C-alpha cells in the first residue's frame, strides 16, 4: 500500500475553503498549490483532520479521521458525532437500486435536523452538494452521491462516503470511509475506528 494523496488540516486552516469542488481545503504551503497543510503550528484543543488516500495495485482508497491534542470543545465533539451519524444514514440507504441523489438528500436532511444545514460539506458558496464519490482506479470517479445525480447504485460499486461539518474560523470535523456496495449492508474497506482520537 502506498500513500497516494492526503492532507492534514488543523484549527482554522481546516475552515479555509478549497478552489476545488470538495468540502476540505486549507491554505497550503504555497500559492502555487493552495490546498492542504500550512506552516501554522498545531494547537491544543483544536480539530486535526487527517484526510488521506492509499493506493494498492492501481486501486485507491480514501479515509478521514479526526484527532486533537487534548480535549475538543463540546460543540466540535457533537459535530463530529453528527458526521458519524450521517455516515450511518448514508450506509443505511446505500443499496442496489437506490438513486444517488436520494442518498445525498437523506444525508443533507439529517444534517439539517441536527442543526448543521449551513455548515454541512462546507459553508456559503464553498458548500458542495455531495456526500460521497466513487473510488477505484481514480481517487474521485463516478458514482457521486450528489444532488441532481440520476445514477442508480449497483452492487460492486466502491465509494468513499465523507460527511464533514465546518466551523468557520475554528476548523472542520468529520469522517470518511471507503465502502463496497453489496446486495446487503455495505462492506467497509477502511477499518480504523471513526471516533475522535484525543492525543
Place the predicted regions along the sequence by residue.
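Active-site neighborhoods and metal-handling regions in enzymes and metal-associated proteins
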Residues: 1-199
Amino acid at each position: 500500500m502506498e500513500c497516494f494523496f492526503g492532507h492534514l488540516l488543523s484549527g482554522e486552516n481546516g475552515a479555509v475553503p478549497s478552489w476545488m469542488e470538495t468540502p476540505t481545503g486549507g491554505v497550503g504551503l504555497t500559492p502555487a498549490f493552495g490546498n492542504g497543510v500550512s506552516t501554522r503550528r498545531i494547537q491544543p484543543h483544536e480539530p486535526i483532520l487527517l484526510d488521506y488516500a492509499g493506493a494498492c495495485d492501481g486501486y485507491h482508497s480514501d479515509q478521514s479521521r479526526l484527532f486533537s491534542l487534548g480535549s475538543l470543545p463540546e460543540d466540535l465533539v457533537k459535530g463530529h458525532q453528527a458526521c458519524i451519524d450521517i455516515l450511518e444514514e448514508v450506509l443505511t440507504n446505500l443499496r442496489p437500486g437506490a438513486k444517488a441523489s436520494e442518498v445525498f438528500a437523506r444525508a443533507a436532511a439529517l444534517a439539517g435536523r441536527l442543526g448543521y444545514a449551513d455548515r454541512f460539506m462546507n459553508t456559503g458558496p464553498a458548500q458542495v452538494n455531495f456526500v460521497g464519490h466513487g473510488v477505484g482506479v481514480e481517487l474521485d470517479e463516478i458514482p457521486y452521491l450528489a444532488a441532481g445525480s440520476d445514477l442508480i447504485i449497483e452492487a460492486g460499486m466502491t465509494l468513499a462516503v465523507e460527511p464533514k461539518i465546518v466551523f468557520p474560523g475554528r476548523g472542520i470535523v468529520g469522517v470518511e470511509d471507503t465502502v463496497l456496495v453489496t446486495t446487503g449492508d455495505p462492506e467497509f474497506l477502511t477499518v480504523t475506528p471513526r471516533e475522535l482520537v484525543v492525543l
